[in-house]
């Protein structure tokens, strides 16, 4: 709030609960545990809050500036002495109509390691204070995606290449940009193309790179929440790369997906 002004209430999502025990009881049988020795925690937690004063319209949709973070116990050694806690924090633009996050690389911290709450506060403040929303530049970049059309034939080529990429030798994969998703997510992109009420194909119209971004963002929503941020940023980078290739400005190998 000190950086961005008034925020909406924090929204949280947790993964499945883990029934555990306190460290001093780790060698007991489950049947021998007293109630005060049992613990319950959620392996992963994600939270977001929206900046009330930064809402824009992009391609007919409301877009909010959003901050948030992820904490995953799966990255920590819970039964050892105190070690650094691992967090991920981000700032990004969220498409309000379907909760898709259009995350750009200037607002993602990656993994940060902290020993105290003061460390967390300091590192989060460093990211938030250094973040420039680039409202015109970033949103202009996203809005411009609508100006690059993708025919059904071309969409099918991209989908086919996404499937093919997964089976290429590692040596070939290293030379190509990637969208880090599996078959299930690729299928979800196709489903979005066919039936998404907001971004799906409409009779007599071509889709655009903006639609492609929404299919990809929607597809990675089912990823574990501690992996979702990297995948979401990857979606944005991938579609921007596809657009450059379509406009003849490819420098990173995205033309492979169009051939």
Task: Label each region the model flagged.
Residues 1-2:
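Charge-rich, low-complexity N-terminal segments
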